[in-house]
Amino acid sequence: VKYVHYIKNFLKNNDCKTLLDYGCGKGHLYMEEHYESVTDVIKEPLPYFWNLDSYHLYDPGYEDFKVLPTEKYDAVICTDVMEHVPEEDLGWVIREIFSYAKKMVFVNVACFEALKKFRDGTNVHVSVFHHQDWLQFLAHESCNHKDLTIYPFFDGFFEDDVDHVLTQGYQIDSYPRIIQFQ
């Protein structure tokens, strides 16, 4: 929810009218009957708030959304997903995400362990890396997608402030050139 306004601006700036939410969860923010129970940050479901012509929700963990799309979309967003992907699968997952985008990708990654654990005690955030490592990984993977603008946002504890989760946002464009948002 905290990124809906950022994403709205990125969609507008990149003239995006179609969207894939890769790892959408239950997709409640997209549904007229559910979005109000999830947040008061927006006053309408995301397709209207973002002025989308069409969208596709994908999440292999939910029966209603487990079908991969068959087409490309102007934008792909992926929030709170990559840290749950085992390290050995990160490459193919991000390449798959990039392959569905025509114009832009928004990726949000938590760079810290989660409070939740699997039954065996393993943290559910199985790929926890420093935001600079994520940034370099995404920049490297974006080299084969020079037509895309990538917006990675990282949540973490920065500059030894362990009391507050902070967010740092970047833009990776066609060079690849990395720009930090201030």
Question: What is each model feature region?
Answer:
Residues 1-75, 91-94, 100, 111-137, ...:
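Conserved N-terminal segment of class I S-adenosyl-L-methionine
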Residues 75-81:
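A short beta-strand submotif of the Rossmann-like class I SAM-dependent methyltransferase core
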Residues 108:
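Alpha/beta-hydrolase-fold catalytic nucleophile elbow
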